[in-house]
């Protein structure tokens, strides 16, 4: 085993806050795609909540649907983003005015067409006091997957632009995060909430050798590249997965449809 530092990964943000014992602090970015059913849980975990442009429409329109027995206005007042940031080409005027009246900070970056809205939000979080106060910051991004593929590719590119920042892209079906080649990785599986399907994907550069443990089909100094072998439709077999590679890899794992109750995990 090499002398690489070990990076620990856990989807503890899918657990109720009172069951989370890690020292991780979370920031949440909501992008302009359908909200995962567990968005209220992520919101409760987060210390900083941002909407990327049209993501504010999703919070305004879709969150009340998760609570059909509660007043929609009360839900909108409860789930107020701290910041709305982006090029402001997607957010509706009525939504923008609503959150401005609630005191949400709005940052218009329509002058910057060279970065994605997710990129803009990541930069804000990296420069925030939350990031300066803790070394255990993790950024959760909903709505980063699904919809147009070029948008998805842009969001995946953000993972590679900030390899020293822990970013997790989330949809209703799965999560994706970067495993930097600078570390050996231990992934602790929340088996009641995620898996068993998973994958390790080299995007950008091939991997000459990747070694894993804890998977149905483990890799042993295996070469992976597009046009050759990539590890998709693999299965987790253990509660802890280890990964070591000479290349940055994307780790993805399915999120189960059961075991995540909105009512159980919200204030």
Swiss-Prot record:
Tissue-level expression: Expressed in roots, leaves and flowers.
Main location: cytoplasm
Gene disruption phenotype: No visible phenotype under normal growth conditions. Tpk1 and tpk2 double mutants exhibit a seedling lethal phenotype.
Thermal dependence of catalysis: Optimum temperature is 37 degrees Celsius.
The UniProt record lists the keyword Transferase: yes
Alphabetically ordered keywords of this record: ATP-binding, Cytoplasm, Kinase, Nucleotide-binding, Transferase
Catalytic activity of the protein: thiamine + ATP = thiamine diphosphate + AMP + H(+)
Assigned EC number: 2.7.6.2
Database matches in Pfam families: TPK_B1_binding, TPK_catalytic
PANTHER family xref list: THIAMIN PYROPHOSPHOKINASE (PTHR13622), THIAMIN PYROPHOSPHOKINASE 1 (PTHR13622:SF8)
Stated role: Catalyzes the phosphorylation of thiamine to thiamine pyrophosphate (TPP). TPP is an active cofactor for enzymes involved in glycolysis and energy production. Plant leaves require high levels of TPP for photosynthesis and carbohydrate metabolism.
UniProt protein name: Thiamine pyrophosphokinase 1
Annotated organism of origin: Arabidopsis thaliana (Mouse-ear cress)
Highest classification ranks of the organism: Eukaryota, Viridiplantae, Streptophyta, Embryophyta, Tracheophyta
UniProt gene name: TPK1
